[in-house]
Every structure is written in C-alpha cells, then in structure tokens.
Amino acid sequence: MNRREFLTSTATGVGVLLGSTTTRAHGSAAQATRKILIAGGGFNTPFIRYMAELTGKTRPKLLYLPTASADSPSGIISWYRNCAPINVEPSVQESFIASSRQSRSWEEVLLSVDGIVCSGGNTLNQQAIWRAQGIDVVLKQAWDRGIVLGGASAGSLCWFEEGTTDSRPKQLTIVKCLGFLEGSHSPHYDAEKNRRPLYHELIGSGQMKPGWACDNDAGIYFEDNEPKRFVHTRDAAKVYYVSLEGGRVVEKPYDPERIA
C-alpha cells in the first residue's frame, strides 16, 4: 500500500468511527433543528448570550473559529472577554495548526461543542482553507446535528451561497460560500458606503441572487433556512431583504428586537 492509499484508507476509517460517536452525542441529523445566528458586524456579548440560549444548555460549550482573521491573537482575546459575563465554556480552534501540537481531528473538536462562532476577516481565504482542510464538510455535519452556527462579517457571509466581500484587492467583489443558507448576503450594510449600491446593482443585473442584508449590530436567527427572529444591539440597526420584482430592485426593511 502506498502513502496516498494509506492516508485515504486511514481517513475513511477515522471518519466512520467519529461519525458514529458524535451521532450518539448530538442525535441524528433527521431529528435536529438546524440553527444559524448571524450579524452584519459585531458578534459581541449579547449575540453570544443569545447563541448560548439557542443551544438549550445550562452551560454550553461555545467554540471560536478564527480562520478568516488568520487566527488573530487580538480576536481571540476579544472572544474570551466577550464570553466572560456569560455562563458558557468558551474555547478556540485555530486553523493554522501542525500535527505536532494538535492531536484531535477537526471532527473531534467541532462536533463536541454546542455552538461555533466564526470570526470576521477575509472570507475568500477562509473558504479556501476550510475546503483544503475539510472543515467545510465538518461544519455541515455540525449544522445537520443541531450545533448552533454563527458569526458576523465573514462569519455571517460564509453560511450563504454567495455575497459581497472585500477579500480581494481594489474593490468589493462576489465570493461563493458554503451555501447552507439559500441566497446571498451583504454584511456591514450601513457601515461601508459601497455595500448597499453594489448589492442593489448585482441583484438588479442578475449577477447575484436575492438575499439578506444586515447593518452592523443587527442580525437574523435562522432555523432550517427560515428566518425566525430579527435582532439588534443598536436602535438604528436594521435587517433588509433585497430582491428583484418586476425588473426593479426592492429593499424590504425589518425592525429587529433588541437583545442584551
């Protein structure tokens, strides 16, 4: 058996073993409600507290996945600071790792928690790393098993089919993402002047599917692809559904409920 055959065989065997273990821990995919909580920007303490409530656990295990920020130390510090006032068990899983210092697989780590928060940063790089490492597949397993997923900016955009990103030089462009949530997404809708006009242009021209736009500090809770609740931590922050009707772009605003 050559090295490639050995690695493939080993990975397949480990995947089957871990799959059976984690299914017992979280229940079958058919029984779980799939949950995603997003924010246009600012996934801070109130959003983390709301995610903790969505898990249904008294002291849930919440994991921070800072791939998009290149495992930024300052982001990790902020994560622990934002979790401090809440009754949660916080942890971090870096993506820039080595086998010499990490003995647990992606499945063992990501499928053992109750919620996963993805950082902001470069969405394009995030998607490339996830696919190279197989993290995208594990996140889908987590979603199917009822582990609450979430994040803001790149951490909200990543769950949709596509959206607008500043991940490339010079200007905002389109990025293709995981596609757990149908349609497109625009974060930072009120915070960056080019976000709204570009989103309207792309949807109006048919280059991008209709979708959800979120101001900073505003967000949406989805169950099984359906928006269940609109929330915010700042009074002026709103959520919008942007679509094409009769050949023109229509922006429908929603007034979120405050969370604290």
Predicted regions and their residues:
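Short internal beta-strands
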Residues: 63-67
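N-terminal secretory signal peptides
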Residues: 1-2
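Class I SAM-dependent methyltransferase SAM-binding "motif I" and its flanking Rossmann-like core
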Residues: 119-196
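General beta-strand structural signal in soluble alpha/beta enzymes
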Residues: 38, 92-93, 117-118, 149-152, ...
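Portal/gating segments that form or line small-molecule/metal binding sites
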Residues: 69-125
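Short, flexible loop segments at the rims of nucleotide/cofactor-binding pockets, characterized by
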Residues: 40-42, 92-97, 125-129, 189-190
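N-terminal export signals
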Residues: 5-25
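C-terminal and late-domain segments of enzyme folds
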Residues: 28-59, 69, 73-85, 115, ...
